[in-house]
Regions:
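Membrane-interfacial helical/loop segments at transmembrane boundaries in membrane proteins
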Residues: 67-82, 179-198
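Cytoplasmic-side transmembrane-helix entry/capping segments in multi-pass membrane proteins
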Residues: 18-22, 40-48
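Transmembrane helix-bundle signature of multi-pass membrane transporters/permeases
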Residues: 1-2, 47-50, 54, 95-101, ...
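Structural signal for the N-terminal portions of transmembrane helices
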Residues: 46, 151-164, 188-215
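Helix-loop-helix hairpins and the membrane-proximal interhelical loops
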Residues: 46-94
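Conserved small/polar residues in nucleotide/adenosyl-binding loops
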Residues: 217-220
């Protein structure tokens, strides 16, 4: 999901990401059928990236256009100016949407598109991202129901990890998100608002996971 956010942010919404897929496939195919395991591993890695680019292009092409549906856009914007309640509401929306789609990369792409088009602001986009981090754990937990004890423990750890992260980020919501915003604006030097908001969400997702990992790793 983090890689998806950074790729879309770096390449933009107007670049045909799928155009990168064919050269990658041409490069990966001979390696994929190589007799050497090291070359085959490289081929599989590049092959996966090629399909990732194709999937990202499909997500971008099929994302809902709220601008063409003013009634839906007005409905969404009715719930964007209720203070911290809007943050909590969009967090639940992000979680439920990801549970339904069962692909956090897809909901991340939708979030980036909504923020880049100005349909929701950066802070509400962050709330959706937090919800997506919780919603994405449902797939793992459902799959673990038929697995062994280790699989169920791993799925539960994934859920606890993300819920713990969401809880402390909500406590420090504005300081944390504003710090990420400052980093993108002043360190990465991204000034275009439509582009900057995508980088801010990608940077937030990265900072969230790194910070959460460090907190849990250093806790007794």
């Amino acid at each position: 999901t983090t890689v998806t956010a950074w790729l879309i942010s770096a390449l933009g919404f107007k670049v045909d990401i799928a155009a990168f897929a064919l050269p990658l496939l041409a490069f990966a195919l001979p390696l994929f059928f190589s007799g050497k395991s090291s070359r085959k591993s490289i081929g599989e890695f590049v092959f996966g990236f090629a399909f990732l680019f194709m999937g990202l292009q499909s997500l971008k092409a099929n994302a809902p256009d709220l601008g063409a549906n003013p009634e839906m856009l007005a409905f969404v914007q009715n719930y964007t100016d209720m203070g911290f309640f809007s943050i909590i509401l969009f967090l639940f929306i992000g979680a439920i949407l990801t549970m339904i789609v069962q692909a956090s990369a897809a909901t991340m792409a939708i979030t980036l598109i909504m923020c880049a088009n100005g349909w929701i602001d950066y802070h509400l986009g962050v709330a959706l991202v937090l919800g997506e981090n919780i919603g994405t754990t449902v797939t793992a937990n459902l799959a673990a129901l038929t697995g062994n004890t280790q699989a169920r423990r791993a799925a539960l750890a994934h859920l606890v990890f993300n819920i713990f992260g969401v809880m402390w980020v909500l406590v420090l919501f504005y300081p944390f998100t504003n710090a990420v915003s400052w980093f993108v604006t002043h360190v990465m030097k991204v000034s275009d608002p439509a582009v900057a908001v995508s980088f801010k969400l990608a940077a937030f997702h990265t900072a969230f996971n790194i910070s959460n990992t460090c907190l849990l790793y250093t806790s007794p």
